[in-house]
């Protein structure tokens, strides 16, 4: 999971890019990068760390130019090496930099094609560098000194023909402008908007609408599946459908966990979707246990708060904040490595005994993935004096790996894989476990008149929308990307890139 942003402005965009990445920090805390363009020269700064740590004053002063792109990263493919921080760069044609959110499922085939047919070299294990080289090659074969929007859209069409998976991309073509595009299934989110200044109109492309809001941009719309937007350095905007058979199937887990609640994705309010998740959970509890003895509903900060509030309201039960969060600790789900996650939970949360002592407590979380967080939190609730500890997941059981850019690649690291609800309840130490039903989740997110064909719910139902994911592929990525393998692969690769200081 990553966050991307691109801006075409009328003055230096370094501060705006920095601010946008800070707003998107929840999408990745492993690395950050910004590249800008001024007088056909590129200025890059990227490294491991949070946005505030990667960019010091001296770096910001060097990032000059009215056009630029940025990225925050959590690694799902490749490694956590700073060599794989984005944006990536290739010098031919034109000098192209690229930032990518998602994951390609045919990356091995593409890497082979790039080397044997396109005669290009890829220096890292990142599928983002592969995607960049595919785009660069398809633009190079147009053989134009000055590429037009038609050339750029033709190159994006070829990317769609060759690349399979979920991807949202923003790329900067030196001296020309920025291009954003979305995979033909619209799995990963991307939006664009504009703001009016005294010097003219400025444009932004970003992963989430909240980045536009905070910086004073007006949301124009989401990119459609397979669509591309090209904005020239002069501020001319072009859009084009570049996929042959687009299908609207965005990832439903964005609404469950990944996105900020104040974002609008594909015309859907994330906040409103989470309110409805709480309503659906309450209805299920009232159906299955109309005589429940829940005394208080307590959310696990922060994502579950919206659903928990509506759950309590619909049940007619008190809602209380029972945990104090240390806001200087990152999100545990997107922390590399199980050991880091376990250590982080106790550092991040502390129970308020007053809210637990002698009560039947219903804890609410957005989802249960590995079970690391909820198991420790349930134990904390018991230590704080809870009489009974019940647990509610606003999402259905996560039973299958995600292959489109979320860090759930290994099925055997998912606590619900091949286990019943009762099994999971025992493993996490809950007296009662309630999962959201998948039809209810789909209705909560997509209820009403929306343009979506269907959601990608692969982590819940094992149905992968790209149609190329089989057992052999899942076994291969499990071996390549489980926590044990990641721990062994953190050797630092050489950085072959722009001067980076």
UniProtKB/Swiss-Prot annotation:
One Pfam family in the UniProt entry: GATase_6
Glutamine amidotransferase type-2 domain location: 2-234
Protein name listed in UniProt: Amidophosphoribosyltransferase
Stored NCBIfam families: purF (TIGR01134)
Keywords from the named record: Glutamine amidotransferase, Glycosyltransferase, Magnesium, Metal-binding, Purine biosynthesis, Transferase
Known EC number: 2.4.2.14
A Gene Ontology cellular-component term: cytoplasm
Root EC class: transferase
Single GO term (MF): magnesium ion binding
Active site: 2
Function: Catalyzes the formation of phosphoribosylamine from phosphoribosylpyrophosphate (PRPP) and glutamine.
Cofactor: how and how many bound: Binds 1 Mg(2+) ion per subunit.
Stored CDD domains: GPATase_N, PRTases_typeI
Statement: the UniProt record of this protein carries the keyword Glycosyltransferase: yes
UniProt cofactor(s): Mg(2+)
Swiss-Prot/TrEMBL catalytic activity: 5-phospho-beta-D-ribosylamine + L-glutamate + diphosphate = 5-phospho-alpha-D-ribose 1-diphosphate + L-glutamine + H2O
UniProt pathway annotation: Purine metabolism; IMP biosynthesis via de novo pathway; N(1)-(5-phospho-D-ribosyl)glycinamide from 5-phospho-alpha-D-ribose 1-diphosphate: step 1/2
Keyword Calcium: no
GO term, biological process aspect, one: purine nucleotide biosynthetic process
Family the UniProt entry places it in: In the C-terminal section; belongs to the purine/pyrimidine phosphoribosyltransferase family.
Binding site for Mg(2+): 303, 365-366
